[in-house]
Regions:
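Extended, well-ordered protein cores
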Residues: 1-154
């Protein structure tokens, strides 16, 4: 049974996930002992979770994978990302190179869906003039991609 409940803001809360993951890893809390809630309810960190945890060194590919997967709408995205971090910190630094690993395969599928959604927004979103130098457009993304996509349109 999970002893630690981590509440994050709705959407893609990469900063909240990063902070929580650092504390959990510093306290050596395995993924099976953590539940993740992306509905913004109150966090119930256990007393044994370090309040201030140092940054951990991760392969660039792991960081990039997490940044993409956190944007997916899958309710298990944070649990999957933390499982990846846990295994990398336990010595599997080249884990992302093992495409046959079930965790890696699932993460790759989530990343692919997010990147496809980003591509569709880049390719198909068209702005129309709404008068007086104002432009409007409509696109309903399948995932939480608005933040990473905004740089493209600015």
């Amino acid at each position: 049974m999970a002893r630690h409940h981590i509440a994050l803001d709705p959407g893609a809360d990469i900063a909240g996930f990063r902070d929580a993951a650092r504390r959990l890893l510093a306290s050596q809390i395995p993924p099976d002992d953590v539940t993740w809630d992306a509905q913004g309810s109150t966090s119930l960190f256990g007393e044994d979770v370090a309040a201030n945890a140092a940054a951990c060194m991760l392969p660039r590919g792991v960081v990039e994978m997490i940044q993409d997967v956190v944007c997916h709408r899958d309710s298990q995205r944070y649990a999957l990302c933390y499982a990846l971090l846990w295994r990398v910190q336990q010595g599997e630094r080249a884990l992302l190179e093992v495409a046959s690993d079930p965790l890696v395969h699932r993460l790759l599928m989530l990343r692919k869906a997010v990147r496809r959604d980003i591509h569709k927004m880049h390719a198909f979103l068209r702005f129309r003039e709404a008068g007086a130098g104002r432009f409007v457009a409509w696109y309903e993304p399948a995932h939480f991609i608005l933040e990473p996509v905004t740089r493209f349109f600015v």
